[in-house]
Amino acid sequence: MRRRRSAKATGKKKKPQKKTAAKKNKKARKKRRSFFEWLFSGTTRRSGRRFDSLRLFGRDVRLSFWPVFLVVIVLLLAIVVLLQGNSISVDEQQVTMVGLPEDLEGYRILLLSDLNGRRFGDEQATILREIGTLDYDAVFIAGDMVGSGGDPQPFYELLEGLPSSKPVYFIAGDSDPQPVLDVTRDITGTVEQMVLADWILGAIERGATYVDAPVELNVGDSSIWISPADMLNLDAGELANTCEEQMLQEQEGTVLGLQSDHDTLPSTTYRYERAQRLLNAVNSMTAADVHISLAHEPPSDDFLYASSTHNSSEEKYLTQPSLVLAGHYCGGVWRLPLVGAFYIPSSTAERHGWFPAQEDVQGLSTAGGTQLYITAGLSTTDSAPLMFFRFLNRPQISIIELTATLPQSMLEQ
């Protein structure tokens, strides 16, 4: 038998020992890649084929298909959001009212809502340009024009750009600063000047009417009553008596030198004057008058149904409104193809607002026997803070045209 010769005897170098399994695994372990390494890795996971090359910073960079595809999709979506977010849409809606006075046939209302302190161009040029192309008789504003930011200037710019010949009526929304001060101003002036917030007084100075109680708008020989929706189911007489009693007590306390009564008297007087204006409206409205109620958040069916059950002969409550105008939902903010809005910020909706019926999101519907129109508004809502931009949902202004003519769909039945 032949003996094996040692490495020394043969003069050959000894082969290095094989690496241990642990070292092999460590070497074979895949290096974690950053996002940019993944994006510019140059190969696809399946085939390893190169997709394309790009000269970037003086070097040839290889691009992978799927990462680039995803980036392109994100950029396209961002462009869509940017373009649609600054493009105003107009929704024109006819509202049929049986027995509408002839003076009000074809009367057109421009409805705005939910600006939330946003600007559309310098001094609201984009909105005002679109409004300038429309034919309308009055402007109704359904709240949240200032928003939680508290800056009224964008709202003021819009008011200043509207024609002075068109009457403007507005209410506050849930995201707006409080319309009434907690601590009244210690000044000599009207009750409103002592108790109303600066942004409300600023809007009034620019020609708008604050609808904190029913207001009568005369059109020819006919009347439109504009009311805040939160007064629909109030007993006007009882409210006026309660406020008057409290006001008289505080007046007496003020004379006696009670500081607490002196401090609260302006607010109580303001509430009493509101109650008196409500009572006057209840006593003045006739069956021939049109009653339009302004709400920020759309009222529930039960609330509107209750307003239809009051006996007008009792002269306690406002008559059932012919139409309620509202905003707040902002068209659902995010809308999906074939689905529409999948969420609205509503405490009274089914499923807490998730997957609502689309007729409850925007447009004309009937709630509690009353016609209700919801505009999609101009911006977003603080009630859905994660939806801080609109998606597939252009900002909207609405034109409401009153008519006594039945719609074609009803005539064909």
What name fits each language-model region?
Residues 117-122, 147-150, 174-181, 213-219, ...:
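Active-site environment of divalent metal-dependent phosphoester hydrolases
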Residues 110-113, 138-144, 148, 167-174, ...:
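Active-site neighborhood of phospho(di)ester-bond hydrolases with catalytic His/Asp-centered motifs
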Residues 5, 23-103:
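N-terminal membrane-anchoring alpha-helices
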Residues 160, 299-395:
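Conserved beta-sheet core of the metallophosphoesterase superfamily
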Residues 65, 71-158:
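N-terminal active-site segment of His-dependent metallophosphoesterases
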Residues 123-219, 317:
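Core catalytic region of metal-dependent phosphoesterases/phosphodiesterases
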Residues 183-199, 203-207, 220-294, 301-302, ...:
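Binuclear metal-dependent hydrolase catalytic cores centered on His/Asp/Glu-rich metal-binding motifs
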Residues 37-41, 48-60, 65, 376-413:
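A short C-terminal boundary segment appended to hydrolase-like catalytic domains
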